[in-house]
C-alpha cells in the first residue's frame, strides 16, 4: 500500500501479502481451507466442522499475521458471518480476503478495522454501495513483494465498509463487478477466506462462517 512516513517502517511487512500456508480439511459446509500465516504470533484456534475460528493477540504483535477459514478456490458467492472483534488498539482488519491467480491480485472486503483504514493511503476508485452501506474502494500496486507465487508485482483491491459491522452477509459479486471496471480479473481465483489480519497492537476476534 501507499503509506505515510509514520507508517512506512511499521508497514514494511504488514502488507507483504503472505504466501498461503494451506491446511486442507474435510469438506463441511463448503469450507476446505485454513489460512494460518504467522498464527503463532497469537492464540489461533479453529474448527472447520463448525466454521469457527478465533485469534487472540492480547500480548501484542509487531509483525503481520493473517488467519481464517474459507475455500481453496474463491468465487463471487456471498458469505454470511458473525464475529466478536476487538481491535481498537491494533492495526487490524476483519475482512473477506483472497487472491486471483492472473492477472495476479490480492483483495480485501473490509467489514471492520482497528486504527488504520487502508484506503487512507491508497489510490481511490470511488465508492460502491452494498449490503446496507457505502464502501470506499481503493487500489495499490505492490512491487517485488511476497505473494502466492513467491516474489512478484501485483495489484491490491480494497473495499472498506463505512458503516463497520461484525456480522452480516457480504455480497462479494458487488465488489468483484466494481473492481472489474478497474482491471480486476474476476476469474481464475486462488484461495478465499473470512480473515483477521493484524500487524501491531493488541486485539481479539472470534468468527463464525455460516455460508
From Swiss-Prot:
Chief place where the protein resides: secreted
Top-tier EC class: hydrolase
GH11 domain sequence ranges: 19-210
GO molecular function, one term: endo-1,4-beta-xylanase activity
Activity as a function of temperature: Optimum temperature is 60 degrees Celsius.
Pathway: Glycan degradation; xylan degradation
Enzyme Commission number(s): 3.2.1.8
Annotated PROSITE patterns: GH11_1 (PS00776), GH11_3 (PS51761)
Catalytic activity: Endohydrolysis of (1->4)-beta-D-xylosidic linkages in xylans
pH dependence: Optimum pH is 4.0.
Keywords: Carbohydrate metabolism, Glycosidase, Hydrolase, Polysaccharide degradation, Secreted, Signal, Xylan degradation
Gene Ontology annotations of biological process type: xylan catabolic process
GO terms for cellular component: extracellular region
Active site per the UniProt annotation: 106, 197
Residue intervals passing through the bilayer: none
Localization (cell): Secreted
Extent of the signal sequence: 1-16
Family of the protein in this entry: Belongs to the glycosyl hydrolase 11 (cellulase G) family.
Function: Endo-1,4-beta-xylanase involved in the hydrolysis of xylan, a major structural heterogeneous polysaccharide found in plant biomass representing the second most abundant polysaccharide in the biosphere, after cellulose.
Name assigned to this protein: Endo-1,4-beta-xylanase 5
